[in-house]
Amino acid sequence: MSSEIEVVEEIQSNPKENGESSSKGIEEESLKNDVYTAAAYGDLEKLHRLVECEGSSVSEPDALGYYALQWSALNNRVAVAQYLIEHGGDVNATDHTGQTALHWSAVRGAIQVAELLLQEGARVDATDMYGYQATHVAAQYGQTAFLCHVVSKWNADPDVPDNDGRSPLHWAAYKGFADSIRLLLFLDAYRGRQDKEGCTPLHWAAIRGNLEACTVLVQAGKKEDLMITDKTGLTPAQLAAEKNHRQVSFFLGNARSLLEKRCDGSSPLGRLSKLGLAPVLWIMILLLLLVYTNSVVLASNLPKLTTGIGALAWLGFILATAGLFLFYRCSRKDPGYIRMNIHDPQTMKDDEPLLKIELNNPALLAGNWTQLCATCKIIRPLRAKHCSTCDRCVEQFDHHCPWVSNCVGKKNKWEFFLFLLLEVLAMLITGGVTLARVLSDPSAPSSFGAWMSHVASNHVGALSFLLVEFCLFFSVAVLTVIQASQISRNITTNEMANALRYSYLRGPGGRFRNPYDLGCRRNCSDFLVKGYNEDIECHEEDATQRPEGISMMQMQRNPNLQNGNGHVAIDVNPTHNSQSAHVHSANCSHSHNSKSKSDNVPLGLGLGLSRNPTRPVVSP
């Protein structure tokens, strides 16, 4: 049995093709002179004339059952909405589907109108006939800023289920709005909530094939989230495979395998696994130093050390030992963990909110929702990142190094770089000393073949030391050069790897731009003296970014074309056909190809979720 969310979009047809006359519905001329159109367009002067001179009512719905206040809310007409309220408009008036003006304001994220409505007494928890609150609608359309506003300032419930048991997180996961998912998880939305079909948000993201949504949910979740089955007995990975979303199926299956193999940190084996490869590297360096000392520096079958060679030999030993000390500090030091903001349920009061969000936080004002960490429950700095291995957010995250069993970040990158630098210098010196000592053996034969045989039989330790050092030197040297280059440009390994994803690394025109690069000399001096590079705020605005503001170019109303919730189709782009979404009720079904999905968000509020039990199972 197949599991599916269906969104059927109807394209507005041409009246000529259907043989319809221009007289169908309400005349266009009359539309231009009613309070509803004036409210939608924000024509306050015309609205004033219609209400105060012609006696038009603002408290009555139009022929389709919608209020003027709803139209003004949809298009963020604040002045018009204020006028309508002052002249009898009811902020809690509902249309035939139970929707209020607040529902309509959530469609396009009209925060200003929503704030006005709520200040005038609008119910933030008002539900329509489908159980949708404003938070559901905002999640359906990816209006993250709207969600943040009504939850943080007006205590809207970010995890309330609708009539089908689906929370805003279900909707955001299905629609693939990763930023909304981050915010909802940040607000402690329940990842494991199952709707009437037994589906969690991860199930719906998998069905739709939204890889980014699945990634955010998995990173913030646990192994159990991947193992939950719906009423058909399928996990998210199996549903993704059924829908032929192979990349999502592979990701979910691989994530489950990794989490299942991860040992419990409280067990002896788990504590041992947390040590990583640091003990291996530590033992390797100690063994190399031991072999170097016994088989090269103090070797009895080699000539006595001269003053110059002896000084170099012990300098290499000292550098390697100092590198070991820095290696220990790097592996044990706090790399820049950011304090987690997780409440203790036992000490929380019943009326205390799970999390308090600062509305004036620069990250939220700028719309940088990727700075929200759903695991640590913090708004992390711009250059910080959550490490999946350490399960903590790290300031100026560079990378997680398994060889030091720790992250490399703002507070330990100095030790990490100097450790690499000292070890490279030590390998150069000790390798050169070893080669010089072996070549100076007076008992060695002159022919190359005989000399090799002599070295292999009489200087096994020195030869082994040279071979191991040769293998290690190039990889460590390359890593050191890369780190030095990044330090000189004040950029991290993580930023280099994700330069195309991070908006703060893009300048005008989308080209790469590092706002933190103060020049090679300043970058290097800051790092060597302070131990880290400074973060410089980037005050330049990207003109190419789409604003959160609401605008409406043109509007057309067709009384015969409605969506399932009763919203009239609105054409905001006259060069494209308008669309409306059809709500699937329990009594209707439509065939739908899950492989072809529209990335456009329907303009109506009706985005009903439905399962089609009659569809055959699609094999991957």
Curated annotation (Swiss-Prot):
- Which InterPro entries would you find in this protein's record? Ankyrin_rpt, Ankyrin_rpt-contain_sf, Palmitoyltrfase_DHHC
Q: Where does this protein reside within or beyond the cell?
A: Golgi apparatus membrane; Cytoplasmic vesicle membrane
Q: Which residues cross the membrane?
A: 277-297, 308-328, 416-436, 462-482
> How does inactivating the gene affect the organism?
Plants have various developmental defects, such as short and branched root hairs, short roots, small rosettes, short stature, as well as defective male gametes and pollen tube germination. In low light conditions, short etiolated hypocotyls. Lower S-acylation of CESA3. The double mutant tip1-5 ixr1-2 exhibits a reduced plant growth with stronger developmental defects phenotypes than each single mutant, and associated with thin cell walls and reduced cellulose content in iterfascicular fiber cells.
GO cellular component term, pick one: endosome
Topology feature Extracellular, residues: 298-307, 437-461
For the biological process aspect of GO, one term held by this record is:
regulation of secondary cell wall biogenesis
* Domain DHHC stretches: 371-421
Keywords from the UniProt entry: Acyltransferase, ANK repeat, Cytoplasmic vesicle, Golgi apparatus, Lipoprotein, Membrane, Palmitate, Repeat, Transferase, Transmembrane, Transmembrane helix
* Molecular function as annotated in GO: acyl binding; protein-cysteine S-palmitoyltransferase activity; S-acyltransferase activity
**Gene3D superfamilies per the UniProt record, alphabetical:** Ankyrin repeat-containing domain
Q: How is it modified after translation?
A: Auto-palmitoylated.
Catalysed reaction, written as an equation = L-cysteinyl-[protein] + hexadecanoyl-CoA = S-hexadecanoyl-L-cysteinyl-[protein] + CoA
In residue numbers, the region (Disordered) covers: 1-29, 576-620
Tissue specificity, in the record's words, reads: Expressed in root, leaf, inflorescence stem, pollen and floral tissue.
Residues on the Cytoplasmic side? Answer: 1-276, 329-415, 483-620
ANK repeat boundaries on the chain: 30-60, 64-93, 97-126, 130-160, 164-193, 197-226, 232-261
Q: What is known of its domains?
A: The DHHC domain is required for palmitoyltransferase activity.
Annotated family = Belongs to the DHHC palmitoyltransferase family.
Purpose of the protein: Palmitoyltransferase involved in cell growth regulation. Contributes to the palmitoylation of CESA3, thus regulating cellulose biosynthesis.
Quaternary structure, per UniProt, is: Interacts with CESA3.
Q: What is this protein called?
A: Protein S-acyltransferase 24
Upper taxonomic lineage: Eukaryota, Viridiplantae, Streptophyta, Embryophyta, Tracheophyta
